[in-house]
Each structure stands twice: as C-alpha cells, then as structure tokens.
Design a protein with these regions (language model features):
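Rossmann-like NAD(H)/NADP(H) cofactor-binding core
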Residues: 15, 20, 82
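A short C-terminal helix-loop "cap" of Rossmann-like NAD(P)-dependent dehydrogenase/epimerase domains
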Residues: 37-53
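Short-chain dehydrogenase/reductase
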Residues: 5-6, 65-68, 72
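Short, flexible catalytic-loop segment of classical short-chain dehydrogenase/reductase
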Residues: 24-34, 86
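Short C-terminal tail/terminal secondary-structure segment
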Residues: 69, 80-96
Length: 96
C-alpha cells in the first residue's frame, strides 16, 4: 500500500492532488474488539496491547479520524507522499 501511495502521490501532485498514508497502531475498536472477544483473557490482552505503546494506550478511532481530517485540511496543504504514524509511539519502541 505504501509503494502504491508513493507512486500515486508522484503522479497526481502536478494536478494538485495530495496522496498520503495514515498508519495506525492498535485501535480500540473493530478488529481489536474481535480479538478481545475471542481471547481467553480479554483484560490481559488489552493491558498487553496498551503496554506496547509508549503513550500507554491503544488509539481511539477518533485519534485516527483526527489525523485524516488534519491531512485533508489546508494546514497540511504542502504534504504529499507521506506516511503519518498514528501509533502512540509504537514504532519508536519496536523499530529495531
């Protein structure tokens, strides 16, 4: 997906169209709720997933939505071909 968005950003930039990626960490919703429901110990799984993030919690759906809204705004008008991590610091802790 990242390579596709980079290619699209380069191709569409001359037309004023910006293409970016949003890369969330664990989000407290959707698939995470399914995983928690299937777990023998959902509270322990929630604690472990939260502990993976230096901010100490999983993302909320609104955390990801707010990042997308910002990228769509005029405040991000000069940003294209970028990946925005919305991961509570997960990558800085686990990118070795």
């Amino acid at each position: 997906m990242l390579s596709l968005s980079y290619a699209a950003a380069g191709e569409l930039a001359p037309r004023g169209i910006r293409v970016n990626n949003v890369a969330p960490g664990w989000v407290d919703g959707g698939f995470t709720h399914q995983a928690l429901a299937a777990s023998d110990n959902p509270e322990r799984l929630r604690e472990r997933a939260s502990a993976l993030h230096p901010l100490g919690r999983m993302a909320l759906p609104t955390d990801v939505a707010n990042a997308v809204i910002w990228l769509l705004s005029n405040q991000a008008a000069f940003i294209t071909g970028s990946m925005l991590l919305v991961d509570g610091g997960f990558m800085i802790q686990h990118n070795s």
